[in-house]
């Protein structure tokens, strides 16, 4: 096993990351999220954000699954490895985080929904399962229907 992967502070020290740029991308993602939130008055302090005048603003980000889970890991204080390997969100899905200020000036994030596809269901549109391996081994690396392969995506 790789027990370090579960540790929010030490997952990058695992042997899997001794080469490559994941460490640099992780630090850039953390800094970018903190800089964005600072523009809204939220200053990172450990695993929470200090905010003198929290507002009910909405911030919308469009990003790839990998970066999204890195951002969520940073905001929730969990190793992104758990999210990368334990969650699946399809293209065009919606994930919603909210802030809570239980103590005046202390803001934390909570995930309200992850990978919501209700807009596709409402329009009777199919969703991709390409991010998943089959539930039972088939020799294929995708769960998308075979006819999607011939058409590019769908």
At which residue positions do the language-model features occur?
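Phosphate-handling substructures
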Residues: 1-40
